[in-house]
Amino acid sequence: LGGEGMGYYMTAYSIFNPICALCVAGFPVAVSRLTAASLANHRREEPRRILTVALLLFLPMGLLCSAGIYLAAPFFVRIVGNEAALGAVRAIAPAVFFCCISAVFRGYYEGGRNMVPTAVSQVVEASVKLGAGILCAMHCLETELGHFTAGEPVCGVTVSSLEEAQMVIAPYAAAAAIIGVTVSTLAGCLALALAYFGEPHTGSDRIGAAGMIHYSKNLLVTALPVCAGALVVNLSSFVDLMSVINRLNYAVSLGWEALCRSHPQAGLERMEAERVGNFLFGSYSGLAMTIFHLVPAITASLGVCALPLIASLAARGSRAQLRRTVESVLRITVIVALPLGLGMSCMAGQILQLLFSSNPEEV
């Protein structure tokens, strides 16, 4: 996609992440915590009932948020100053709904200390995201460049040069790549659903009105604080999106030549001024931030694995063992994160050149 295409791609992701965090972040934690507590107290029937209530409670929320992203997409892209990203934002909207379903199933399995379905679904999701995203983007690029070679309009626009054709294609290619992301969330959701419905279940998951209210209250009490915390963290990317592109465009309007001299390797002088802000944002978010998120992804898995054990110990009142477990998790997190963070700081250039050698302008 290059820096420009990544700008459109990451614009969609930066809008998607805080809304997805608001809808999804607390679901697996709440379901996992309640499931682990039920199993610790030998209430074997409760986990399926918790899952049923969670699905009934959270799926409408995911559907509403998906519809909200799709309908509000023109407003979002206008306030961030990147209106060409409209297609990418709308393409990622259904992913919120699929993520809600996946989050509930993952919480159910993680609460029972069965990480296999979660791991399988994440492998499926990552594989489909890579394959479908690349295939969709390549199909879009090859088709439209073929139209340019044949002298036909590119994406409905008549162009006179290859650079102009690539500029016109970039937002459509980014939207095509985002379709791969949405398809991958559907694939991960199906993997979890198949795992659940493919295993034997004993007992009934029927639940009365009183039980529905009881479980709903417990789920919301646990989920909402986690969702709020995740929203605050992810809002930083949305604030970046609103401020960075607009500030970069303002900097270009003030000192185009100085900006070109400060980044000679990026080839900014060959671009139109209105494209530079999106290109630089794509380089920042698509390359630098991608590397940055590797460390939190590793450490977050420690918390996911530890949560069922912590909830089980809390339910049994084992405070001493609970404290030792939390200290162990924090210790391992520091041991992993500190050297990785220092290494990334000291070798940032070499890491980017190694992983993105085909994108020297963006590096």
Predicted regions and their residues:
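Interfacial transmembrane-helix starts/ends
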Residues: M10, E45-L59, S216, L220, ...
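Alpha-helical transmembrane segments of multi-pass membrane transporters
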Residues: V120-M167
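Signature of the first transmembrane helix
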Residues: L1-V29, S66, Y70, V96, ...
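Interfacial/gating helices of multi-pass transporter permease domains
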Residues: L1-P18, A170-A175, H214-T222, I245-H293, ...
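Interhelical loop/hinge segments that connect adjacent transmembrane helices in multipass membrane
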Residues: F148-I178, L190-V233, A251-L254
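Helix-loop junctions and terminal segments of transmembrane helices
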Residues: A25-A40, T299-R316
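Interfacial segments at transmembrane-helix termini and the short loops linking adjacent helices
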Residues: P74-I92, E327, G343-V363
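Membrane-interface junctions at transmembrane-helix termini in multi-pass inner-membrane proteins
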Residues: C100-S121
